[in-house]
Design a protein with these regions (language model features):
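Extracytoplasmic small-molecule ligand-binding "clamshell" domains
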Residues: 1-65, 73
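Periplasmic-binding protein-like
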Residues: 6, 83-87, 178-181, 185-213
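Short secondary-structure boundary segments
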Residues: 6, 65-66, 92, 134, ...
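Short helix-initiation/N-cap motifs at beta->coil->alpha
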Residues: 25, 40-51, 114-117, 152-167
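A local structural motif
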Residues: 29-43, 124-126, 144-157, 169
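Alpha-to-beta junction loops
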Residues: 36-38, 44, 54-63, 128-129, ...
């Protein structure tokens, strides 16, 4: 059995009939064919994903899960099968558009340029409500103090984050960049990426299959 969230497009989601679809669902099916296994892909809420794996409700996680040192304390990962960068997103016309930051920040590198970019973000996000999915690397980053003491609002799913961003209940949101671009393309909503992309450090080292230790 393989666990996935079914609520994080384009990685994994559900069609109108409730069937699991997405890049990871297709990848899991192909891997099972190659290994000649009969696999069942099951849906699991994100915040219970790792506990469910540990409790043997399924044998592996394929759910857009980034490989981080913190998660390695509880589970093991395969080699990464995809790169992922995070990004802030706002509605077009936001005052946060045009922030003077580098195109990307790798937190693993550190150095003066990273510190300068984080200071710019800290100033820009002061007093803003930043929305993100609970139990994610994005929540961990926002609550780490790297961008000051921001007002973080968390949600059970990325769909809920997108809804509150477009309805104006969030000033800005943080997630995988592809989650926002996919949503903007499919919904037609004027959601735009702002600031730098984020990788390394708290954001991990790519996306991998989570496996019990």
């Amino acid at each position: 059995k393989i666990g996935t969230e079914g609520a994080y497009p384009p990685w994994n989601s559900k069609d109108a009939s409730g069937n699991l679809i997405g890049f990871e669902v297709e990848l899991a099916q192909e891997l099972c064919k190659i290994m000649k296994y009969e696999c069942t892909i099951v849906e699991q809420d994100w915040d219970g994903m790792i506990p469910a794996l540990v409790m043997r409700k399924f044998d592996a996680i394929m759910a857009g899960m980034s490989i981080t040192d913190e998660r390695k304390k509880t589970i093991t990962f395969s080699q990464g099968y995809a790169d992922e960068v995070a990004s802030l997103a706002v509605m077009k016309g936001s005052s946060l558009e045009g922030m003077d930051t580098p195109e990307g920040i790798n937190l693993s590198l550190g150095g003066s340029s990273v510190k300068k970019a984080l200071k710019t973000l800290t100033d820009a996000l002061a007093g803003k409500t930043v929305c993100t999915q609970t139990g994610t690397i994005h929540q961990n980053f926002l609550e780490s103090g790297d961008v000051g003491s921001v007002n973080v609002r968390t949600y059970k799913t990325q769909d809920e984050v997108n809804l509150d961003l477009t309805s104006g209940r969030c000033d800005v949101a943080l997630a995988a960049a592809v989650a926002f671009t996919d949503y903007a393309d499919k919904s037609g909503k004027p959601v735009v990426l702002v600031g730098p992309t984020f990788s390394g450090g708290a954001f991990g080292n790519g996306v991998g299959v989570g496996i019990r230790q």
